[in-house]
Amino acid sequence: MNIFLHGLALTNYRGIGPIRQEAQEFTTINLFVGPNNSGKSAFLAFIAEQLDCFSHQALGSSIGRTPKKMLKQNDPHLGHSQESVLFDLYLPKKKIHEVIRQEAKKNSNEYLASPENIRLFTDNLADGSFVWIQYGAHPRRFVAAGKITNNQKYTAPEIINATRAIWQIFRPSYTGGTFDQNWLPESIAQVLQSECLSLPRSVYIPAIRQIGAKGEQYEDTSGKGLIDKLAEIQNPGHLERHKQVDFDQINNFLRSVTGDPSATLEIPHDREHILVHMNDRLLPLSSLGTGIHEIIMLAAFCTLAKNQIVCIEEPEIHLHPTLQRKLMQYLAAKTTNQYFIATHSAVLIDTPGAATFHVSLVDGQTTVRPASTPSERYRICSDLGYRASDIVQANSIIWVEGPSDRIYLRKV
């Protein structure tokens, strides 16, 4: 289970206004659920565009300083400047503990890294089991860490002494200094210069997906270049045979969703189509229906990505409930990524082990709150317009693929 990003808070970004909105305790699969136009894609957009390969270490260098996409003019919340856009990253206390212990061992001053000193230092910064590290999005800059943003006027002597001990771990040849000017800010800076706040590549899968023609570059996850990429892992060179494992894994998933143990993908030499061997027939993938076409694309994108953060817009499009559940099971069990998903599917809310966040629009601003209890998830369903009476009080039920199909049923 890979968890690269543990928590994120945003201020003045898109639909999120000056009231800071936070989501924390991320897991492998994280769901942002809400009705249309509630702003549920704001977190995904920020992760994909602004946190791609983020590293605190790169803030002070010319290498890696620029995010994937600079803030656009319409990214700041209405009436606010780009400089007002802030983001906070959640850093678990245990990661800070690890950094301090490793540094003490390296500098042979482990006696300073007593459990009590480490506890007092981190508790002074922490909100529960984590520390929020705040940055400005434009220009990219460090702003503050933890509770020091509260401008506390009094600090207990034992905290001051513990902080000095931690400072001496990072600055073994230094003496003197003060708590406010040296020991605390320099200790925080040294912790953040470690790898504890470095994120991998982030990938964005849009809601509109379509397998592109041959010869296109596989540069994004819209479907362009997918045929050529699958052909590459179907028959890799002798030095890259390990890539075929991914192709076999996608085939196993195809067999799971079709219920046919013989189902197999094939990319022909002309690369005009993705073909499927199934039930002693050879068919283009598109002939199996939009749902199978869609879910195989998603599985391929997420299998090809390795140890990355993947943001997916509305994966439920064209998928009936069983396929939605199978997709979530596949992502959790067979891939190595962390997922952030914007959805309005009630089916996905019940994904085992997923962190769910309820996104709604209140007084014109996007609000985000956790939904971990049955009552909180019920409120999501109510907000989405789901009602038990929609099914219970119906005389009969006819399933259709979309609203446009209703025109065929007017005389039924």
Predicted regions and their residues:
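Switch/communication elements of ASCE P-loop NTPase nucleotide-binding domains
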Residues: 1-59, 249-391, 395-397, 406-411
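Short, glycine-/Ser/Thr-/acidic-enriched flexible segments
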Residues: 210, 404-405
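A solvent-exposed, charged loop/short amphipathic helix patch at secondary-structure junctions
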Residues: 219-236
